[in-house]
Amino acid sequence: MEAYIYRTLDVEEESFAALLEGANGPLQHLRFSEGPGVSLEQVTAWTRLASTSSGELETARIFEVIDQIRKQADMVPDAMVVLLTRTPHAGHWFSLGEGNSHYMHADDWNLFTATSFRLPVTYMLASNIIMRGMYDSMEELTCRAHQQPRGCLLDLSWPMASYPLSCLGMPFPL
């Protein structure tokens, strides 16, 4: 599976190259590359135009930018497209996605980790895209993870109802 990453000018070329190298290293079944057909300047302009007066991106506007990218790049509908920018999400999400359209925030990771954004963004890229292969929407993920669990993800040999509560993250009996 190939994922095309479109970055804005505020994501430095050197950091982006290191991100691609890191993401493409251990993940042989996923390939990440810089998206074709749309210039860096155009992606940046669309992202700035979509931003609120406080310089943030609302969820709906993120997907509008990605739709513009898809249209100009003449992407097939099932192509995986990622918008990577230092422009923050208005709800303070580091990443979000719906279907084959994803947003990754490349800034403020230093508030949570001592590494550059490359490691956490590589993790988010992989996990979001792998999750997309498993679930069609966040609603389905929520349903499968919280409402219809079939057992422990780490050991599917037990039905969920027979697990001790401490294994389910509950330190005390109900």
What are these model-derived regions, one by one?
Residues M104-R144:
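Active-site recognition of the HExxH zinc-binding catalytic motif
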Residues M1-Q68:
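Propeptide-to-catalytic entry region of secreted or membrane-anchored zinc metalloproteases
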Residues V43-N100:
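Active-site-proximal segments of metallohydrolase catalytic domains
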Residues I5-E12, V82-T87, D107-D108:
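Structural motif
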Residues S39-A45, H89-A90, W109-A114:
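A short acidic, often aromatic-flanked loop/helix-cap motif at beta-alpha or helix-coil junctions
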Residues E14, A90-F94, M138:
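Short, solvent-exposed secondary-structure capping/transition elements
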Residues F32-L40, V81, M134-A145:
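Short glycine-rich, low-complexity/disordered patches
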